[in-house]
Amino acid sequence: MTNSEIQDLLNSQRSFFAGGATLASEYRINALKKLKNSIKAHEADIMAALKTDLGKGSQESYMCEVGLTLSEISYMLSHVKRFMRERTVATPLAQFASRSYVKPSPYGNVLIMSPWNYPFLLTMEPLVDAIAAGNTAIVKPSAYSPATSEIIKKIISECFKPEYVAVVTGGRAENTCLLDADFDYIFFTGSKAVGREVMRHAAEHLTPVTLELGGKSPCIVAPDANLKLAARRIVFGKYLNCGQTCVAPDYVLCHRIVYEQFIDYLKKETIRQFGERPLDNPEYGKIINKKHFNRILGLIDRKKLVLGGACDEAALRIEPVIMRDVTYDDAVMQEEIFGPLLPVLPYDDDEAVISQINSHDHPLALYVFSNSRSFIRKITSRISFGGGCVNDTIIHLATSNMGFGGVGGSGMGSYHGRDGFDTFTHKKSIVDKKTWLDLPMRYQPYSSFMDKMIRMFLK
């Protein structure tokens, strides 16, 4: 789409929003029901698209994309009326007689820019929240996952008129045109580099943003952890979607006392989950494109390999890799991996672990495996991170009952459930003043008596 076409689309959404149709709860509920029914009707098409773009198997696609989207819609259908209600708050005595309340109101016209790694979920879930909050939306899926982008466009065009919700496909040129436009809110999921560009463009219009970014999410394995279970859950979280998950354990810090034993468990568990020949496993995914394939291969230090390392260039598949005796100076520790490589570093001192993690950008996620409540409290209290798990990985984002988001370099803002509704909602603070009483203290001319009265109320 050209700049003028995008501007025309945005203008049509502004006009539609100004008409007030999206303010009604029934309108929002009907829209969500339409979307839910369409997703169910196109489930096979969605699965096929995800297989084409990322090599995902059907169970993983439903568990991590379609099912979570349907769950978010169901949650909003159950709660949206309550979320929309005005909330009465206490009124100061000095403002007697009046009623004070907070009125949730949609921002208006929002832009949702989504990534390629979970292209269906990370497009639809923020859209669900935006619709529930009463906004119109323009959705821009990633050009790197074209098959999924097309099915998203088909579903949305079947459910909604473009003046309500529309999809813009394309690449960098379309992204630039969209970011040059004046939206009321921008929701972006992707890399830090592009996130900075989004924020720069948003600043030109003073547009509020949510940035869901990433980072090197650490996984700490204490000496008292259930090592076998820790290995199982870390392997699941790391190699899901071939490691292309923003909250995947990026690296493991394992206490030296149990280091050798844990490495052995990791190796056995990886083989158990993916087989001796993972490149022949139809449920194991692929890297999104050749650029990322080559980047990931460049991070492997073959002198430190414990497992894996083989690849299929034609199919863009890399075996699950485990690397041992990694240091913070190694190439694999200089950037977010975003692929099926798991570096395992030994540690000796809790304080050194805390200091090392805090010396870098705040991670999007943190995972700690331990049975010591004091150790868990120390780690989760003294390290800044977006969210995480104790004795598990990645499952903290698979719920609508609490928000998900980053902090510092891993992003700003949150969504899912109530947090998602609030993200796309401006809360108007309103005082409804009665007319049968008008206290004179605030009006000029001032007097010593009025001053005493004011000081009595305001202290």
Label each residue range with its predicted role:
Residues 6, 25, 43, 227, ...:
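Residues at or immediately preceding the N-termini of alpha-helices
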Residues 17, 21, 36-39, 43, ...:
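Structural signal for hydrophobic packing residues in well-ordered secondary-structure cores
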Residues 28, 73, 134, 165, ...:
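Residue-level signal for inorganic ion chemistry
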Residues 160, 193-327, 390, 452, ...:
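ALDH superfamily catalytic-core signature
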